[in-house]
Amino acid sequence: MPPPARQRILDAALRLIQQKGIGRATTREIAMAAGAAEGSLFKNFGDKMGLLTELLSYELPENQAWRAVATEAPPGHGDLAAGLVLFMERAIVYYAAALPLTAGSFADRELLHRHQAINRERGTGPQLALQGAVDWLRGWQQAGHLDQQADLYAMAVALCGGALICAYSEQLAGPGQIRGGRDGLIHSLIDTVAGPHMTNSADADPHLRTQAASDRRAQG
């Protein structure tokens, strides 16, 4: 049984936007590639910017994998260090997938304004990732792994921002241009941003953090 029209449209939109960019991909092409009526696209998403917003905020596989960290590394279970490494790895992969999709809207003022308007109407946008990170970190704080003085919002901004600049640099300058590489950046950020606020002895020791991350990779 084929997937519902809504899912086929999302899948086709992702393929075409990746191939052509948001500015050049038309709603007619997307609907044809999905084997659906163009009216179905408008009914479900409004327009192609509505489609892009849905992909970036919820449907992009890399976004779903990033959000799954909350259940794969639940607060209070296992160690925070390994959870933060997983969080950063998934965040970088998400931003690497999202940046090419959004590039076209930044290059076209009309598309950008439409994208901003949809985000305001739907309450979507990059701030969702920040709030999700804050909620996850708060769970670890409540479980006693982060001290009560930690500014969780600032911590989330630093971690997400580091992931974004890593993805951006790798795409425009190529891998290896970030000092220490991707893994080095992840561990340095965790040590600098979260390390001083970790209260669990295993989390707070840099050597044990690195070992925990290596163990998690070996298991995965």
Please annotate each region the language model reported.
Residues 1-4, 198-220:
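N-terminal intrinsically disordered/low-complexity leader segments
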Residues 6, 27, 49, 77, ...:
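Short, structured helix-loop boundary elements
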Residues 8, 15-58:
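Helix-turn-helix
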Residues 23-24, 145-150:
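Short, charged helix-capping/linker segments at alpha-helix termini
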Residues 57-87:
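Amphipathic alpha-helical linker/stalk segments
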Residues 82, 96-104, 112-143, 153-157, ...:
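Amphipathic alpha-helical packing segments from all-alpha helical-bundle domains
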Residues 86-96, 103-111, 189-193:
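Helix-loop "lid/cap" segments that line or gate small-molecule binding pockets
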Residues 93-97, 134-135, 139-141, 156-177, ...:
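Amphipathic C-terminal alpha-helical segment
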